[in-house]
From Swiss-Prot:
Organism lineage string: Eukaryota, Metazoa, Chordata, Craniata, Vertebrata
Catalytic activity: N(omega)-(1-hydroxy-2-oxopropyl)-L-arginyl-[protein] + H2O = lactate + L-arginyl-[protein] + H(+); N(6)-(1-hydroxy-2-oxopropyl)-L-lysyl-[protein] + H2O = lactate + L-lysyl-[protein] + H(+); S-(1-hydroxy-2-oxopropyl)-L-cysteinyl-[protein] + H2O = lactate + L-cysteinyl-[protein] + H(+); N(omega)-(1-hydroxy-2-oxoethyl)-L-arginyl-[protein] + H2O = L-arginyl-[protein] + glycolate + H(+)
Covalent cross-link (Glycyl lysine isopeptide (Lys-Gly) (interchain with G-Cter in SUMO)), residues: K130
Modified residues (Cysteine sulfinic acid (-SO2H)): C106
NCBIfam families: not_thiJ
Enzyme Commission designation: 3.1.2.-, 3.5.1.-, 3.5.1.124
Topology class, membrane: Lipid-anchor
Protein family according to the UniProt entry: Belongs to the peptidase C56 family.
Reported function: Protein and nucleotide deglycase that catalyzes the deglycation of the Maillard adducts formed between amino groups of proteins or nucleotides and reactive carbonyl groups of glyoxals. Thus, functions as a protein deglycase that repairs methylglyoxal- and glyoxal-glycated proteins, and releases repaired proteins and lactate or glycolate, respectively. Deglycates cysteine, arginine and lysine residues in proteins, and thus reactivates these proteins by reversing glycation by glyoxals.
GO molecular function, one term: oxidoreductase activity, acting on peroxide as acceptor
Protein name as annotated: Protein/nucleic acid deglycase DJ-1
Length: 189
């Protein structure tokens, strides 16, 4: 079986933990993860001033698609940048048309709203993004820590980053693999 592939789209102002933790968890599961810089391959300044070096520019990473999952980290400015990007819209529309998994955390799901993705799905966001996400009644809101509805997987925020990453692993590779990845992480049940 060919290995699964993930594209994490990294925008200026992204939440560091929501980028790095799911990326790490997916890589531990053997998923080939590409962290793509929205505006290029240069280091990206995140919401808490941590710099993350992308593996590729989004432009180059798109040429290597399709991916099994597209991941959108949160962070208010990061989510705004994802929401304003025509390239992100095109990638998400293509992923949705192929019924591929789309995963977004914290404020990241607001990019789904901005680009008209997954309307009718049950979603979760950071509590501060709930009102924006529910504007227009395009989604059903969940109070879960992680919510998967069809091919849309969403989560609350930095504190749910491990659960979010493990949910992506489970969706792509099954519960057994997710449990194997989880065990050595010493997470609180």
């Amino acid at each position: 079986m060919a290995s699964k592939r993930a594209l994490v789209i990294l925008a200026k102002g992204a939440e560091e933990m929501e980028t790095v933790i799911p990326t790490d968890v997916m890589r531990r599961a053997g998923i080939k993860v590409t962290v793509a810089g929205l505006t290029g391959k240069e280091p990206v300044q995140c919401s808490r001033d941590v710099l993350i070096c992308p593996d590729a520019s989004l432009e180059d990473a798109r040429k290597e698609g399709p991916y099994d999952v597209i991941v959108l980290p949160g962070g208010n400015l990061g989510a705004q940048n994802l929401s304003e990007s025509a390239a992100v819209k095109d990638i998400l529309k293509d992923q949705e048309s192929r019924k591929g998994l789309i995963a977004a955390i914290c404020a990241g799901p607001t990019a789904l709203l901005a680009h008209g993705i997954g309307f009718g799905s049950k979603v979760i966001t950071h509590p501060l993004a709930k009102d924006k996400m529910m504007n227009g009644a395009h989604y059903c809101y969940s109070e879960s820590r992680v919510e998967k509805d069809g091919n849309i997987l969403t989560s609350r925020g930095p504190g749910t980053s491990f659960e979010f990453g493990l949910a992506i692993v489970e969706a792509l590779m099954g519960k057994e693999v997710a449990e194997q990845v989880k065990a050595p992480l010493i997470l609180k049940d």
